[in-house]
UniProtKB/Swiss-Prot annotation:
Gene designation: rplK
Keyword Ribosomal protein: yes
Role summary: Forms part of the ribosomal stalk which helps the ribosome interact with GTP-bound translation factors.
InterPro entries recorded: Ribosomal_uL11 (IPR000911), Ribosomal_uL11_bac-typ (IPR006519), Ribosomal_uL11_C (IPR020783), Ribosomal_uL11_C_sf (IPR036769), Ribosomal_uL11_CS (IPR020785), Ribosomal_uL11_N (IPR020784), Ribosomal_uL11_N_sf (IPR036796)
Post-translational modification: One or more lysine residues are methylated.
A cellular component annotation (GO) from this entry: cytosolic large ribosomal subunit
Name of the featured protein: Large ribosomal subunit protein uL11
Amino acid sequence: MAKKIEGYIKLQVPAGAANPSPPIGPALGQRGLNIMEFCKAFNAATQKMEQGMPIPVVITAFSDRSFTFAMKTPPASYFLKKAAKVTSGSKTPGRASAGTVTVAQCREIAEAKMADLNANDLDQATKIIAGSARSMGLQVVE
């Protein structure tokens, strides 16, 4: 018989840096899940990734206090900031530019994020990433 799902917990955790402090500890603790077990499993799964890269993770909590987790690709904003070599986007997008990214860089990011994007093909995915760049105050150039 399948386990009864108690709920889902969505977190963004730096790769290789999961520890029981907030926000992970309280989120898992209120569901009665083993915090250290998640931290060890997550850190082992993200060991080969770039340390500190934010990884969205969805934890499925079951009624018997067990869990599973699924990792997604890092946010587009992380890749865009890295490509534009900036630390943050513009405070006034549309008015002040924070940097520039090329369409080729947007295409590269779209290829990496294709599994998590709601797009049918690479061209649509590239447009989604370019839109994210513009909303961050980055200029998209050819």
